[in-house]
């Protein structure tokens, strides 16, 4: 998801270009998660300090359900707005100082703006902490560990056993 922005950096502040987001390559979020983007576009605005990238992307990611621990495909939709600062002055080729904040991404020495890290961070921030495959997911049986979505479980939970909130039950009576 790389875009050559050399020409845009030469244009005046306020100039805009719109690009489709490359959906041919999956985006690796971490060691286990990969996003398959199906559509997206980014608007690149020339600003005084570099380029402001604003865009939207849609796709799918395979997650693990927090109740039944089964993998499922979840749709994702992300909106992002990130600032990119050049590392090389486009007219002279002189190196520029790095951005003063850690939130600004850097355009490489060949004037290539790479959206991958910005997309990765925004997608990860939008994923649920405990994804659920379906609102009706019954989860795993706490006694035998069986998936209650596949077959009903006949196990009887220990009513008097290890219940950390059992003392609160007496307050309800």
Task: Give the positions of each predicted feature.
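Structured interface patches
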Residues: 1-173
């Amino acid at each position: 998801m790389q875009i050559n922005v050399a020409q845009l950096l030469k244009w005046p502040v306020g100039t805009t270009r719109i690009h489709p987001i490359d959906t041919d390559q999956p985006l690796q979020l971490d060691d286990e998660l990969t996003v398959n983007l199906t559509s997206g576009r980014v608007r690149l605005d020339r600003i005084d300090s570099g380029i402001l990238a604003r865009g939207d992307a849609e796709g799918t990611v395979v997650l693990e359900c927090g109740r039944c621990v089964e993998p499922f495909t979840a749709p994702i939709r992300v909106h992002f707005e990130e600032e990119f600062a050049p590392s090389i002055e486009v007219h002279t080729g002189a190196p520029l100082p790095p951005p003063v904040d850690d939130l600004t991404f850097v355009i490489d020495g060949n004037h290539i703006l790479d959206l991958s890290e910005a997309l990765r961070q925004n997608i990860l921030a939008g994923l649920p902490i405990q994804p659920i495959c379906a609102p009706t997911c019954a989860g795993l049986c706490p006694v035998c560990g069986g998936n209650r979505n596949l077959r009903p479980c006949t196990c009887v939970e220990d009513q008097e056993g290890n219940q950390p909130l059992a003392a609160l039950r007496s307050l309800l009576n």
